[in-house]
């Protein structure tokens, strides 16, 4: 794929300012709408990655934009020392939809890696230390998540990893 000089200049700035976890990106995206994204040159693409599974509603969905805008106008984020009505209502909805047994609770995470780490901690709380991981899968970049990841190139630089996988 050929990119414009303007896009190439941005990619060079990226290279100079980022750690290349995924290597050099192929495009510099400027905006999105629904399932489509546009690069800084105005070229339109179908977003087949969905933000690697985090943009299930697509880009710029009006109801999502309205909900985010409303919440940002009230409180953007609070630490775990506090809570909000929205957090309580979201947790109650998850428990209701999951038909969770009485006494169940919710722990909201910032990322998939944090969710994996939490699952490891919860399983260890039972006294069981063995972990079953999905072969061929990527589980995240934290030490615990890398311990479950199949690809040796991701694992080797951080060994020794968690035992019992």
Regions found by a protein language model. Name each.
Residues 3, 44-132, 140:
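Glycine-rich loop-to-alpha-helix module at the N-terminal edge of alpha/beta enzyme cores
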Residues 17, 40, 48, 111-112, ...:
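Fold-independent oxyanion-binding glycine-rich loops
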Residues 28-30, 97-101, 124-125, 157-161:
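Solvent-exposed alpha-helices and their adjacent loops that cap or buttress functional pockets
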Residues 9, 13, 67-70, 89, ...:
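A non-catalytic, amphipathic alpha-helix used as a structural packing/dimerization or gating element
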Residues 38-39, 57-59, 147-148:
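Short beta-strand-to-turn element immediately C-terminal to the catalytic PLP-Schiff-base lysine
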Residues 1-33, 87:
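Active-site-adjacent loop/helix segments that line or gate small-molecule/cofactor pockets in enzymes
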Residues 26-48:
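Active-site and channel-lining beta-strand-loop segments
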């Amino acid at each position: 794929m050929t990119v414009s000089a303007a896009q190439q200049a941005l990619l060079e700035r990226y290279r100079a300012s980022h750690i290349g976890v995924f290597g050099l990106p192929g495009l510099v995206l400027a905006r999105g709408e629904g399932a489509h994204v546009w690069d800084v040159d105005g070229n339109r693409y179908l977003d087949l990655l969905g933000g690697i599974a985090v943009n299930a509603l697509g880009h710029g969905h009006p109801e999502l934009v309205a909900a985010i805008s409303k919440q940002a106008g009230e409180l953007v984020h609070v630490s775990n020392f506090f809570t909000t009505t929205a957090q309580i209502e979201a947790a109650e909805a998850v428990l209701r939809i999951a038909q969770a047994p009485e006494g169940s609770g919710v722990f909201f995470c910032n990322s998939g890696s944090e969710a994996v780490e939490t699952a490891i901690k919860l399983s260890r709380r039972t006294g069981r230390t063995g972990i079953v991981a999905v072969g061929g899968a990527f589980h995240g970049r934290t030490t615990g998540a890398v311990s479950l990841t199949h690809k040796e190139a991701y694992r080797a630089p951080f060994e020794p990893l968690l035992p019992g996988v």
